[in-house]
Amino acid sequence: MQISDIEVDGYERVARCIDKASGLHALIAVHDTTLGPALGGMRMLPYASEEEALFDVTRLARGMTFKSAVADTGLGGGKSVILGDPSIKSEALFRAMGKFVESFGGQYVTAEDMNIGIPDLEIVKQETAHVTGLSRESGSSGNPSPYTAYGCVVGLVAAVD
């Protein structure tokens, strides 16, 4: 597993992970942790290039910073992306992703997003405690959609005020 940092102005940390054994090619962006650890979902898409994925992960991480601040969650903003075909998933891929998340030492907490479900996150959790939105049976908050919706409503109210 090779993890390397990518310098991006205005971001606390952006990193790339390539793990040939599992086929993982992923990016994590932490925009700001002033208010707390960076929270942001993990998505998996067949990006055309790493540059496209980098644009997406940084844009989304920055958005999470503002959404978290407006909703007064006590969290910062981050995001992760896996570059790949979401129809091709494996335990090894998600275990490697869990190790990548763990390498941030709690600075980034992941959750589900596009093409990532609770079963995928349960595998990630085998390698890191820094994952949320897991099943209620595992002692977590369950489906994060209500919290996402709440954040959107609070953001809209703040924009109107």
PLM region spans:
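A glycine-rich, Thr/Ser-enriched phosphate-binding loop motif common to dinucleotide/cofactor-binding enzymes
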Residues: S138-V157
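N-terminal ligand-binding/catalytic initiation module
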Residues: M1-G142
